[in-house]
Amino acid sequence: MFKDISIKDFDPVLAEAMAAESVRQENHIELIASENYCSQAVMEAQGTDLTNKYAEGYPGKRYYGGCEHVDVVEQLAIDRAKELFGAEYVNVQPHSGSQANSAVFLALLEANDTVLGMSLDAGGHLTHGAHINFSGLNYNAVQYGLVEGTGLIDYDQVESLAKEHKPKMIIAGFSAYSQVVDWARFREIADEVGAYLLVDMAHVAGLIAGGVYPSPVPFADVVTTTTHKTLRGPRSGMILARDEVLAKKLNSAVFPGNQGGPLMHVIAAKAVCFKEALEENFKTYQQQVVKNAQAMAKVIQDRGYEIISGGTENHLMLISLVKQEMTGKEADKWLGDAHITVNKNAVPNDPKSPFVTSGIRIGTPAITTRGFNEAQAGDLAGWICDVLDSRGDEAVTAEVRGKVEAICKELPVYAKNQ
């Protein structure tokens, strides 16, 4: 019986929720910087019988039989990622970016070793030393921030803290920073104190693959990333390195140190994603992602809203609402009512709690996949400001929602109207 089961017939409640989410994605504008729309080919790979196969170990060195075909799948993903990023070593087994980071900690550090990373309210990630995360609970985490007034990474502070605390590992990377990171400066600082340099490029991996953002691979000892976001693949993770000196440690940290069997259907989807990213049109897409972000930033700033660091050189921006005396939670709700999805986000020295915040983060990967150009991105930024200026006024929200519905029909996600 199970061979013929369909979700619609067997589990209509689940089917209804899934269908509703498909409708939401088609009819709402997605501006969460970490979200994107993957291709039908990526989704097709994830929905195959590869999901049935257990394959502990690595290609050619498995603990289970019957892995000759999944070995081909995983090796394809590895080889394509190496070509895409110019890395000598790649591990495509991490289930997420956080698990990739966790594996690097396990490979390179001992418990209570000192790590230096960007603080959450400056734009860092939980796994960069936040006190509520494994990286802050199990290690001595020291945090750097931004230059007050400019919103740029305070490299002098990074250097000063590195000299003072002698970290075993320095983490460069971010989840809410809109400028270009100076990877070479981080390398210099790491070398000064004899630290490993880990770069978490999760947010900008697609931009790097597309040649519109500098690559950290020549500078870092280890690079981690997710494979969704700007890379437009499945929700998963990956580890890269510039040479194979650390390969054995990293492989052992992923399996058996941090995970059991890899998700072969997801690894197949990564292989598809990397092949897509090697195409010439992927570069054009990434160029448009940045153009759209800059078009939005200009309108938002012209309308009187502050963007931390004064603009954007990548796919995202962090908007401070302190001057407007509104919270990120309010803005998130008001824009959501207009069918524009963003996320509330802390700003530097945020007086509000992480559940409320004083800012919102927006990004352009998803709208660019959808087909937005600079003019349409600028219009969208204006609609956002209209809703915020009105503090969620029902009439203004309804007017903007109508505009959102119209452009969503004009630019469907998967070339079909729901």
From Swiss-Prot:
CDD domains, per database record: SHMT
Disulfide bonds: none
Entry's localization field: Cytoplasm
A GO CC term attached to the entry: cytosol
Pfam families for the chain: SHMT
PROSITE patterns: SHMT (PS00096)
GO molecular function: glycine hydroxymethyltransferase activity; pyridoxal phosphate binding
Enzyme class at the top of the EC tree: transferase
Cofactor: pyridoxal 5'-phosphate
Enzyme Commission (EC) number: 2.1.2.1
Presence of the UniProt keyword Transferase in the record: yes
Site (Plays an important role in substrate specificity): H228
Pathway(s) where this gene product acts: One-carbon metabolism; tetrahydrofolate interconversion; Amino-acid biosynthesis; glycine biosynthesis; glycine from L-serine: step 1/1
Biological role: Catalyzes the reversible interconversion of serine and glycine with tetrahydrofolate (THF) serving as the one-carbon carrier. This reaction serves as the major source of one-carbon groups required for the biosynthesis of purines, thymidylate, methionine, and other important biomolecules. Also exhibits THF-independent aldolase activity toward beta-hydroxyamino acids, producing glycine and aldehydes, via a retro-aldol mechanism.
PANTHER family (alphabetical): SERINE HYDROXYMETHYLTRANSFERASE (PTHR11680:SF50)
Family: Belongs to the SHMT family.
Name of protein: Serine hydroxymethyltransferase
Organism field: Psychrobacter cryohalolentis (strain ATCC BAA-1226 / DSM 17306 / VKM B-2378 / K5)
